[in-house]
Amino acid sequence: MSGANTTSTSVRSFGRVRQVGPAVVFGVAFLALWESAVRGFDLKPYFLAAPSKIGEQFFKNYSRIWDASTVSGGNALVGLVVGTVLGIAMSFILSRYRFLGELVTPLAIALNAIPIFVLVAILNNMYSITSEIPRRVMVTLVVYFIVLVNVAKGLTQVRSTHVELMRSYAASEFAILRKVRVPNAVPYLFTALKVAAPASVITAFVSEYFGGLQNGLGSRITSNIANSKNAAAWAYVLGACLLGLAFYTVSIILESLARKGEAK
């Protein structure tokens, strides 16, 4: 029995290596090519910094990058949670009252088409310069639309045979929602989260370019570029990449836990 468990564990481990391996190999090859290009063509730091210099600046400024990441990450997390809750709530409303979808959807599309910098500029004028609210509101809006579209699709695009079977047993609309629509929408929710999680970091990051406190990753990148410290700026970009990767990884872990819960 223990031998079978060991074999099963080995197979799963090998499967994970096969999934991650190509990405790791590609990443290492890309960094090696980047480093070689900078050294081979003698590119100046103000044009393109070498990965070795970026890594050096990353560890040299680690505490500052961490502080900036907590600010940007905090704004992204607040917006992600609020946007997800609002998106789920509105998707339930739209699935119950279909006529509202015809009214809300065009407005949502129009609002989502407005460039980030325009909305951030308007929000910055509405609040004090020391407020983090504009950035969090911007993240909330981006996440809200992603979650709304996906979850609403999961709630409405169910098999008609399942709904008809429930109705043949005189099931209420709430029972149909709980037994059919919600289980069907769960995969759509996690698909939305895997998109919204890194998008929340990107939005918080970009929002910092257009005013407000100069304490996040985007602001630090701008200030370092202005002072011709390109390697340091790239180090903050690396911090932003790691932050986005962390958010995405958490969304995958949550999906895995949900699947294990369903299996039980």
Question: What role is predicted for each listed range?
Answer:
Residues 153-189, 221:
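Short cytoplasmic-facing helical segments at TM-TM junctions of multi-pass membrane proteins
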Residues 192-242, 249:
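Non-cytoplasmic
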Residues 137-141, 174-207:
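Transmembrane alpha-helices
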Residues 78-108:
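Transmembrane-helix boundary motif in ABC transporter permease subunits
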Residues 98, 235-264:
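C-terminal transmembrane helix and the adjacent membrane-cytosol boundary/short C-terminal tail
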Residues 109-146, 153-154:
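Generic hydrophobic transmembrane alpha-helix motif, especially the helices
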Residues 10-12, 40-81:
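Periplasmic/extracellular loop-to-transmembrane helix junction in inner-membrane transport proteins
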Residues 14-40:
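N-terminal signal-anchor transmembrane alpha helix
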